[in-house]
Amino acid sequence: MIKLEGITKSFGSLQVLKGIDLEINKGEIVSIVGPSGAGKTTLLQIMGTLDEPDAGTVAIDGTVVSRMKEKELSAFRNKNIGFVFQFHQLLPEFTALENVMIPAFIAGVSSKEANERAMEILAFMGLTDRASHKPNELSGGEKQRVAVARALINHPAVILADEPSGSLDTHNKEDLHQLFFDLRDRLGQTFVIVTHDEGLAKITDRTVHMVDGTIKKD
């Protein structure tokens, strides 16, 4: 599903990633852990085509995305990869439903179909009655579930999450973590999650440990 080979990345004189090789299978939920500065977020951004490696290749479902032109890459990203961040990044002027629909509009989906897709996902999240509410009317846990719904709207094969539960309380963290597994079981998606949450890392299918820009071998 996801294959990284020889990934390097430097910012100025600082080498952040030092020849990363990593394969992630379809339907896996993989956590990436390690100390701050280990290169976790940079690796996730390269995996999600938000940044380019200095060297090496990134392939998703057999497509070598690291060789794509920007326009082609943007379309591929919007269709095949969903992103969830620590802070929900919902647009405050739009309702929960409208926020979820935005990536579908970008992909050229009709308003009717986007609405149907969004309502179906919000229903699965238990948020049907919150669809018309704006972000400032939602709880922290609800906002993050809306952000997950937005990541799912185009039925991506891969969900990449960077500290998705970092701003949530214990109860909402547990609910969000369970949601990832429910989604995987229902939709067969692949999840890669950067986290400092030991509880989440323990229940994922596999944990990748990073230290100083490398993957630590067990």
From Swiss-Prot:
The enzyme's E.C. designation: 7.6.2.-
One GO CC term on file: plasma membrane
Domain ABC transporter: start-end pairs: 2-218
Claim: Cell membrane is one of the keywords in the record: yes
Topology of this chain in the membrane: Peripheral membrane protein
SUPFAM superfamilies, alphabetized: P-loop containing nucleoside triphosphate hydrolases (SSF52540)
Binding site for ATP: 34-41
CDD domains, sorted: ABC_MJ0796_LolCDE_FtsE
Location(s), subcellular: Cell inner membrane
Keyword terms, alphabetized: ATP-binding, Cell inner membrane, Cell membrane, Membrane, Nucleotide-binding, Translocase, Transport
GO biological process per UniProt: transmembrane transport
Pfam families: ABC_tran
MF GO annotations: ATP binding; ATP hydrolysis activity; transmembrane transporter activity
Function: Part of the ABC transporter complex LolCDE involved in the translocation of mature outer membrane-directed lipoproteins, from the inner membrane to the periplasmic chaperone, LolA. Responsible for the formation of the LolA-lipoprotein complex in an ATP-dependent manner.
Protein family according to the UniProt entry: Belongs to the ABC transporter superfamily. Lipoprotein translocase (TC 3.A.1.125) family.
Protein name: Lipoprotein-releasing system ATP-binding protein LolD
Species of origin: Bacteroides thetaiotaomicron (strain ATCC 29148 / DSM 2079 / JCM 5827 / CCUG 10774 / NCTC 10582 / VPI-5482 / E50)
Taxonomic classification: Bacteria, Pseudomonadati, Bacteroidota, Bacteroidia, Bacteroidales
